[in-house]
UniProtKB/Swiss-Prot annotation:
Subcellular location as annotated: Golgi apparatus; Cytoplasm, Cytoskeleton, Microtubule organizing center, Centrosome; Nucleus speckle; Endoplasmic reticulum membrane
Gene: PSKH1
Keywords, in A-Z order: ATP-binding, Cell membrane, Cytoplasm, Cytoskeleton, Disease variant, Endoplasmic reticulum, Golgi apparatus, Intrahepatic cholestasis, Kinase, Lipoprotein, Membrane, Myristate, Nucleotide-binding, Nucleus, Palmitate, Phosphoprotein, Serine/threonine-protein kinase, Transferase
Record protein name field: Serine/threonine-protein kinase H1
Result of altering D218A: Loss of autophosphorylation
Provenance organism: Homo sapiens (Human)
Oligomeric form and interacting partners: Homodimer.
């Protein structure tokens, strides 16, 4: 999930106390083919939730019929065998401290497992990244550079890091509350006041990041997780694989083209230098989805999608928009503006009347029915177009995969047309 450009090496820890293993000698034993060729999937993965039904899509594939001459050991149940298999891929220093429980996420160069601290029995997530691959190395460097600096209630916390010659193991908080839109579907009621509570937590985390010179660059619903299943759970921001970290107060412009198409800001599409205002555009898209269950910009054709974004044209037609307050629409309008200089900052967004009125006059109309129907309708449509049963998940309507990442060639062609039109 890297941007395709090299990044600087991680900074030393500042705000977080880390137990960092600088170098671990290779295993003296013989490595099996499974160990050497561990990564086989085709997508990257960020910090992943656990304990939520949808996590089953990341489970280890069910074994097929046994091949000739091969049978499962009768003394070891399949689940125990799978856990043992993944445990064997971890450095002994990790398994000495953490008990490997289950695989909860996988990617082309990473795995995320649920673990338990042997001494305290506290659950954590460990993200294991194969740094021998360039893309994995870039994502690892980016995440470590950010997570070593941050300490905020609404941002995933790094606990400690173990490093070997070919892998990095990042021990992080375990978010068990599920994804944002999965919770909305399950809740049965969702009002503007609920929306402002969610956005206030996310905005406070983004404000903190921007104050440190950190731009997330890939804010989207699946990177916003509930910390626990309770109704009072906080939201945490995850997945900093595309993040840019600069020195505090440094206003230097960024140029790397990266992000997820539906959430990417216009200035990135035309390959102009950009600032952390790209995160605010993405938050405008998230706010729009949060209040309607639909996307402001959407088209299966990338070129048409990008043209929609460049024009900044979206609609408030259809349900539930007639029931949404003008104040909420004004909040979105001030974020989804093509001119990055005119967009609200995170601090300004926190002070917007719609967010400030969260506990007082925000609309209490229940938008749940329309939002749920829109999310499920879009998920069903996506399922038919991809012929994938997994697409029926409610939050699948806002998900992206590697094939949906921004492609340099498409942006070069789009930028050429844009320049020709502008100069003509």
């Amino acid at each position: 999930m890297g941007c395709g450009t090299s990044k600087v090496l991680p900074e030393p820890p500042k705000d977080v106390q880390l137990d960092l293993v600088k170098k671990v000698e290779p295993f003296s034993g013989t490595k099996s083919d499974v160990y050497k060729h561990f990564i086989t999937e085709v997508d990257s993965v960020g910090p992943v939730k656990a304990g939520f039904p949808a996590a089953s899509q990341y489970a280890h594939p069910c074994p097929g019929p046994p091949t000739a001459g091969h049978t499962e050991p009768p003394s070891e149940p399949p689940r125990r065998a799978r856990v043992a298999k993944y445990r064997a891929k971890f450095d002994p220093r990790v398994t000495a401290k953490y008990d490997i429980k289950a695989l909860i996420g996988r990617g082309s160069f990473s795995r995320v497992v649920r673990v338990e601290h042997r001494a305290t029995r506290q659950p954590y997530a460990i993200k294991m990244i194969e740094t021998k691959y360039r893309e994995g190395r870039e994502v690892c460097e980016s995440e470590l550079r950010v997570l070593r600096r941050v300490r905020h209630a609404n941002i995933i916390q790094l606990v400690e890091v173990f490093e070997t010659q070919e892998r990095v193991y990042m021990v992080m908080e375990l978010a068990t509350g599920g994804e944002l839109f999965d919770r909305i579907i399950a809740k049965g009621s969702f009002t503007e006041r609920d929306a402002t509570r969610v956005l206030q937590m996310v905005l406070d985390g983004v404000r903190y990041l921007h104050a440190l010179g950190i731009t997330h660059r890939d804010l989207k619903p699946e990177n916003l997780l509930y910390y626990h299943p309770g109704t009072d759970s906080k939201i945490i921001i995850t997945d900093f694989g595309l993040a840019s970290a600069r020195k505090k107060g440094d206003d230097c412009l960024m140029k790397t083209t990266c992000g997820t198409p539906e959430y990417i800001a216009p200035e990135v599409l035309v390959r102009k230098p950009y600032t952390n205002s790209v995160d605010m555009w993405a938050l405008g898209v998230i706010a729009y989805i949060l209040l309607s269950g639909t996307m402001p910009f959407e088209d299966d054709n990338r070129t048409r999608l990008y043209r929609q974004i460049l024009r900044g044209k979206y609609s408030y037609s259809g349900e539930p928009w007639p029931s949404v307050s003008n104040l909420a629409k004004d909040f979105i309008d001030r974020l989804l503006t093509v001119d990055p200089g005119a967009r609200m900052t995170a601090l300004q967004a926190l002070r917007h009347p719609w967010v400030v009125s969260m506990a007082a006059s925000s609309s209490m109309k229940n938008l749940h029915r329309s939002i749920s129907q829109n999310l499920l309708k879009r998920a069903s449509s996506r399922c038919q177009s991809t012929k994938s049963a997994q697409s029926t998940r409610s939050s699948r309507s806002t998900r992206s995969n590697k094939s949906r990442r921004v492609r340099e060639r498409e942006l070069r062609e789009l930028n050429l047309r844009y320049q020709q039109q502008y100069n003509g």
